[in-house]
């Protein structure tokens, strides 16, 4: 965005009388006219070196940005609010506004003030909106997270049958995908992609069946005219955008898919105005190709973000060892959309295995990868006119790193996925890479208007202009020496003043050499005669003067022309550049997952089409990493075998009982995460893993309410459980934690009981079901594919030690009172709870409720004095000190025996 001189604002017409309303200036009239066409956006109105905002826009922006609200002129008798942001810092302010959910229309001066004056002294410089900045259409580096895709999504729908499809585009990288969906899958499919913005037709936005989904998504939904989604006009729109005569090479798309594609492209055309970001051809995703994970499961498993919205603490953060922005985005994409094809999963696992077997080579690859900039995003900025010299430099650096990687891989025997990636890297535009290397300077400015980004020696005229601009004195001195040699006048000087400019001056006595012959007169043109000197010029000197005066402007003009030439060449090679960049991301992800596997001791899973689910010594990847970081006790690994009994497994459902704080929820989550990691193509935190492909993953773990929609925690739990029971199939994996809590005990037990029976008999899926309803363990006698397992604990002197080990069998207690004590509840409350528990367990509540109250007065604990803690006697202290001084690992067997006798002696004295 280059600065332009602000034109002088024409004055408003004089009032006709004292009561006449104040007229707006022509500039403000222009603002109101442009704003009327962009009512849903804040209008950044260019005035000189600032973007100004007026009226309600100014009030909203000043509050959102924390900038001063001032005023300028009046309208209808009221001051016009105004605020502004400097053009050079506009990206910083746009970032804040977009984050707060605003859309911004950027209005630029589209003519020079001098041109406006030619139309009359009161003419206003022409302005127009050149771009709409929305969350889903960002390209600027400052506005984007390098590790996260920035998708714009459009929903298409056909009239009549109401069939649905989604198309999503990241204009910062050119990624373009499309897939069909259904109303019951719509929210899950949207959340899998996690778009920054969702555009839908007005009619669909107000559809009663779909509106609840849009309400959940909130501000990210942007309704648009239904004409943008016309599937009948989609073919023409696609052909026009991609500049092709036919769509034969694009594949076949359904009508709802065409509607979605049309809506996405139309919205890009609408927001980018005259620019056309280069996009890949839309790639169709087939239903069932990826693991279906519903939104509740995605949130509770904290795949990409924690429940509080942070990246730290998520599975993605725990496994990310990538070193490039493209690699980080590819890793996130694979994690959020695991595959369901064992063959495709094996291809990815082969890549990781190869990297583990070639660690020295892979270390060298990662060093090269660290030098790879974000080539796709640099290319997109260049294509839409928002790029700078450093974006060209990013391409050059990427080509250099790609060349280094290709050299490292030369002759290597690669698995299929990496072999294809190497081939794409080798097809990068080597000629263009060499061109960039010749053209670009080593140090590049941020903005092209600053110049200095073209290498010396690349363009002879540019070198000359720079020499004139930077070394004019040396050039003049050289010309002066030439004239001295030509005339033989050693006192000849070339001087400069504001009247004559550059001129040649000689003494009157020496002037004859310049005037005596016709040849000399034609060569040296007389300018001025002084008392003791004469002044001349030459055609050469006049041209040099003109060149010096215009050298800076000409130098910048040449550089800008070279920039446009290089940009056009980059866009022409967009497909091969993107292919090479994608290939580099594949190498980044594969080597990163190998580093993770080596670092954490992960194993290669065996994934097939069976119903097996046998995890040996599995671990929770996030919790394990947190424990290591805290230097705490190592994570306790556990087995999980949900394989069919015919395959030697324990059955399809594990009913897990055990204490609070025992690790049930962690165990449930870790097995779901292991399945996700395996199917995304990663090694897994286990001793071994055999997983039959999971087609749908459901979880109900953790408690949350939805007060905004009038749903209690229990209601949310029931809705999510209903979705699981209605959708899970034989190849699904279900994890359920404490279903039935939040209501009366027998109600909850009944619901949990019936749910397990339904999972076993109807869904017939693999499932982990954790519960505190110990009565349910009797189901193992009735349901042949159900096994009881429990979290082991050890009791010691009224305390409970959580072993975090899963073992066969059933728990008969939940140790809630002990956990309450550990949590710091007052001792009197803990004691009272223990007494009540004993009464309840003795079955003495079958009578009236007041019997328990009479026997154990509820509030009597408040009147009781806390028992004083026993004082440690001297002898007790001596015994305690002796025990505390023991270093068990340093004792020999003989020393240990002697110590036992000593401790027994001290205990006897006590």
From Swiss-Prot:
Question: Is this entry keyworded Nucleotide-binding?
Answer: yes
* Pfam families according to UniProt: MutS_I (PF01624), MutS_II (PF05188), MutS_III (PF05192), MutS_IV (PF05190), MutS_V (PF00488)
Name by which UniProt lists this protein: DNA mismatch repair protein MutS
Residues reported in the UniProt entry to bind ATP: 658-665
Q: Which GO terms describe its molecular function?
A: ATP binding; ATP-dependent DNA damage sensor activity; damaged DNA binding; mismatched DNA binding
Q: What is its biological role? A: This protein is involved in the repair of mismatches in DNA. It is possible that it carries out the mismatch recognition step. This protein has a weak ATPase activity.
Q: Which stretches of sequence are listed as region Disordered?
A: 1-21
Please list the GO biological process terms of this entry: mismatch repair
- Which superkingdom heads the taxonomic lineage of this protein's source? Bacteria
Please give the PANTHER family that the UniProt record associates with this protein: DNA MISMATCH REPAIR PROTEIN MSH1, MITOCHONDRIAL (PTHR11361:SF34), DNA MISMATCH REPAIR PROTEIN MUTS FAMILY MEMBER (PTHR11361)
Return the GO cellular component terms, semicolon-separated: cytosol
Record's keyword terms, sorted: ATP-binding, DNA damage, DNA repair, DNA-binding, Nucleotide-binding
Which spans does this entry mark as compositional bias, Basic and acidic residues?
Answer: 1-11
Q: Which family does it belong to?
A: Belongs to the DNA mismatch repair MutS family.
Give the matching SUPFAM superfamilies. DNA repair protein MutS, domain I (SSF55271), DNA repair protein MutS, domain II (SSF53150), DNA repair protein MutS, domain III (SSF48334), P-loop containing nucleoside triphosphate hydrolases (SSF52540)
| Organism in which the protein naturally occurs | Brucella canis (strain ATCC 23365 / NCTC 10854 / RM-666)
């Amino acid at each position: 965005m280059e600065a332009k001189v602000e034109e002088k604002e024409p004055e408003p017409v004089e009032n006709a009388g004292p009561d006449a309303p104040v007229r707006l200036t022509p500039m403000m009239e222009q603002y109101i006219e442009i704003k009327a066409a962009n009512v849903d956006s804040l209008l950044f109105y260019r005035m000189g070196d600032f973007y100004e905002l007026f009226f309600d826009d100014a009030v909203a922006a000043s509050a959102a940005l924390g900038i001063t609200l001032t005023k300028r002129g009046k309208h209808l008798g009221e001051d016009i609010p105004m605020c502004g942001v400097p053009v050079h810092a506009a990206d910083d302010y746009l970032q804040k506004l977009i984050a707060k959910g605003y859309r911004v229309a950027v209005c630029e001066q589209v003519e020079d003030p001098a041109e406006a004056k030619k139309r009359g002294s009161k003419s206003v410089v022409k302005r127009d909106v050149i771009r709409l900045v929305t969350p889903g259409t960002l390209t600027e580096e400052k506005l984007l997270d390098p590790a996260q895709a920035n998708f714009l999504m459009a929903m298409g729908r056909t009239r009549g049958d109401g069939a649905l499809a989604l198309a999503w585009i990241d204009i910062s990288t050119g990624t373009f995908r499309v897939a069909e969906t259904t109303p019951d899958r719509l929210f899950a499919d949207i959340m899998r992609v996690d778009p920054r913005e969702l555009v839908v037709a007005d009619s669909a936005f107000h559809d009663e069946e779909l509106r609840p989904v849009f309400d959940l998504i909130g501000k990210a939904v942007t309704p648009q005219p239904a004409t943008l989604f016309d599937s009948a006009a989609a073919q023409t729109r696609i052909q026009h955008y991609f500049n092709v005569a036919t769509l034969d090479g694009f594949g076949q798309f359904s009508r709802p898919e065409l509607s979605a594609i049309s809506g996405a492209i139309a919205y890009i055309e609408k927001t980018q105005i005259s620019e056309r970001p280069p996009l890949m051809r839309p790639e169709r995703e087939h239903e069932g190709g990826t693991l279906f994970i519903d939104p509740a499961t995605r949130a509770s498993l904290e795949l990409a973000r924690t429940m509080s919205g942070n990246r730290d603490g998520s599975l993605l953060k725990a496994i990310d060892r990538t070193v490039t922005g493209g690699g980080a985005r590819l890793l996130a994409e694979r994690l959020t959309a695991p595959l369901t094809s064992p063959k495709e999963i094996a291809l990815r696992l082969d890549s990781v295995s190869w990297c583990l077997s070639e660690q020295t080579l892979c270390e060298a690859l990662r060093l090269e990868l660290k030098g790879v900039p974000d080539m796709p995003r640099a290319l997109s900025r260049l294509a839409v006119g928002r790029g700078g010299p450093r974006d060209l430099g990013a391409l050059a650096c990427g080509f250099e790193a790609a060349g280094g990687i290709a050299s490292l891989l030369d002759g290597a025997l690669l698995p299929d996925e990496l072999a294809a990636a190497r081939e794409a890297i080798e097809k990068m535009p080597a000629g263009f890479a060499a061109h960039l290397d010749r053209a670009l300077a080593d140090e590049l400015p941020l903005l092209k208007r600053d110049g200095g980004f073209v290498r010396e020696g690349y363009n002879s005229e540019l070198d000359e202009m720079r020499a004139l601009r930077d070394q004019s004195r040396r050039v003049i001195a050289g010309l002066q020496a030439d004239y001295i040699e030509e005339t033989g006048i050693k006192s000849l000087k070339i001087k400069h003043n504001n009247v004559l400019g550059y001129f040649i001056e000689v003494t009157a006595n020496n002037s004859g050499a310049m005037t005596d012959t016709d040849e000399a007169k034609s060569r040296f043109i007389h300018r001025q005669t002084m008392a003791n000197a004469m002044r001349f010029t030459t055609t050469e000197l006049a041209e040099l003067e003109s060149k010096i005066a215009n050298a800076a402007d000409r130098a910048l003009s040449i550089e800008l022309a070279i920039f446009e030439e290089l940009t056009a060449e980059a866009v022409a090679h967009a497909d091969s550049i993107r292919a090479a960049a994608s290939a580099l991301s594949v190498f980044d992800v594969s080597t990163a997952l190998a580093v993770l596997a080596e670092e954490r001791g992960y194993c290669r899973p065996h994934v097939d089409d069976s119903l097996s689910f046998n995890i040996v010594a599995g671990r929770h990847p996030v919790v394990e990493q947190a424990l290591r970081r805290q230097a705490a006790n190592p994570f306790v690994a556990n087995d999980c075998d949900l394989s069919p009994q015919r395959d030697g497994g324990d059955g399809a459902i594990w009913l897990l009982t055990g204490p609070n704080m025992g690790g049930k929820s962690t165990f449930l989550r870790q097995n779901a995460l292991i399945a996700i990691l395996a199917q995304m193509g990663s090694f897994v935190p286990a001793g071994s893993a055999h997983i039959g492909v999971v087609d749908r993953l459901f979880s109900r773990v953790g408690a949350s309410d939805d007060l905004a929609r009038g749903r209690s925690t229990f209601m949310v739990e029931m809705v999510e459980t209903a979705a699981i029971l209605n959708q899970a199939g034989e190849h699904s994996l279900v994890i359920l934690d404490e279903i039935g809590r939040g209501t009366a005990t027998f109600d909850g037990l009944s619901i949990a009981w019936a749910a397990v029976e339904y999972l076993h008999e109807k869904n017939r899926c693999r499932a982990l079901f954790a519960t505190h309803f110990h009565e349910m363990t009797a189901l193992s006698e009735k349901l042949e594919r159900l096994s009881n397992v429990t979290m082991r604990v050890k009791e010691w002197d009224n305390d409970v030690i959580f072993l975090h080990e899963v073992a066969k069998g059933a728990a008969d207690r939940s140790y809630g009172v002990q956990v309450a004590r550990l949590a710091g509840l007052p001792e009197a409350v803990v004691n009272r709870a223990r007494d009540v528990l004993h009464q309840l367990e003795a079955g003495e509540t079958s009578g009236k409720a007041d019997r328990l109250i009479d026997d154990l007065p509820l509030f009597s604990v408040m009147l009781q004095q806390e028992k004083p803690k026993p004082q440690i006697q001297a002898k007790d202290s001596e015994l305690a000190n002796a025990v505390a001084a023991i270093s068990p690992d340093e004792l020999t067997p003989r020393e240990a025996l002697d110590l036992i006798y000593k401790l027994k002696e001290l205990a006897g004295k006590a």
